[in-house]
A protein has these predicted regions:
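Accessory terminal and edge-of-domain segments that mediate assembly/interaction
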Residues: 1-5, 13-178
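Acidic-aromatic/histidine active-site loop/patch
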Residues: 10
Length: 178
């Protein structure tokens, strides 16, 4: 088939705001390919195994470059369509594979979705505060400049247990409502 590279595309919920560009993470079992890629989030992230990992490892063993591009979707919108992630993935695919990826209606859909999310967030002060905190978190990580994406310190992200404890404390402090 003349295949010269295998690229898997996916997305995952992340502690990022919808008000910033979608960050892409890259996964690969090839050290050389990892060293050659610039502009992607670097770091170690433990995730459940999946078919993409098997394809990546086997393709690299066969001498075929393989990687996965993963869009970081704001966790608070991860259950709804998020065209900005699809757009970022297409742009990332075009970048790593050296192809022209047709974007179609995605840019307009992403803009319309952004407006709708802005409206929803504006209706709730707690949501506004959360988005502001996420903006600060992401902006601190990106402060080193646009030359290459930063290494995000995943140790600074609260664990599931810490988030659950914080949520329980928040709920305890709320006045009882009938």
């Amino acid at each position: 088939f003349g295949c010269r590279m295998v690229v898997g595309l996916g997305a995952y919920p992340a502690p990022v705001p919808h008000t910033r560009d979608v960050l892409l993470s890259v996964t690969t079992s090839s050290a050389k390919l990892s060293d050659d890629l610039h502009g992607y989030v670097r770091g170690t992230l433990d995730v459940p195994g999946g078919i993409q990992t098997v394809i990546d490892v086997d393709a690299n063993r066969a001498g075929l470059p393989a990687l996965g591009l993963w869009a970081q979707v704001p966790h608070y919108v991860s259950t709804m369509p998020y065209p900005a992630a699809s757009l970022a993935l297409l742009d990332g695919l075009a970048d790593v594979a050296g192809i022209d990826a047709h974007r179609g209606q995605l840019a307009a859909d992403a803009a319309a979705t952004r407006i709708r999310i802005d409206e929803l967030v504006a209706e709730n002060p707690q949501h506004q505060a959360m988005v502001t905190q996420l903006e600060e978190f992401v902006d601190q990580g990106l402060a080193d400049g646009p030359v290459d994406a930063p290494t995000i310190d995943f140790e600074r992200i609260p664990s599931g247990d810490e988030l659950a404890a914080e949520l329980q404390e928040f709920l305890r402090q709320r006045p009882d409502e009938d």
